Amino acid sequence: MNNNTDMYEEWKWQLTKALEQVTLPQGIEIRVWTDADFSAIQRISSAEDWPSPTRRPDDSLFAWQHSWPALVAVDGETVVGFVRGITDGAITMFIAEMAIDAQQRGRGIGRALLDACHFLYPTTRLDLLSVDDARDFYKACGFRTIHQGMRKSYM
């Protein structure tokens, strides 16, 4: 988490209000991420073969510190999933990254993270790019295919 304590407290308050409308799986808590969660984010990302958090950790950490919403799902003390979004707060929220530990899938954690993002900004649409293996999950959450996504990476 960045050093802006006021912003962190505001995010916690916003999330508390949003979570009043979210059904959480048993034993799962969703909270605002902190820098201490970054190694767990790297672990889960690595298991998905996502290179940025491990090959470019400084850039990835910076992205997490400057994104909102940036949430983790925890079971006890263990981070079992995360979502990082980017929003204008009015029209669109882009889900930049979301992953659930493979051993924890099927419990409703991903849906709860997406619902938390939605209820933080209930008038925005949620946009994302999906890998083929996750399409059925997103469709079950109410998403629809709209266009073919594209990406150009510089590293």
Where are the model-predicted features located?
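Helix-loop element at the rim of GNAT/NAT acetyltransferase active sites that forms part
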Residues: 32, 43-55
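Conserved active-site tyrosine of GNAT-family acetyltransferases
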Residues: 138
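Conserved acetyl-CoA-binding loop-helix of GNAT-fold acetyltransferases
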Residues: 100, 106-119
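A short beta-loop-alpha structural element at the N-terminal edge
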Residues: 28-40
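Conserved GNAT acetyl-CoA-binding A-motif
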Residues: 119-131
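Conserved beta-strand in the GNAT
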Residues: 72, 78-87, 92-94, 99
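Conserved acetyl-CoA-binding loop of GNAT-fold acetyltransferases
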Residues: 141-148
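A short helix-loop-beta-strand connector motif used in the catalytic cores of GNAT acetyltransferases and
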Residues: 61-72
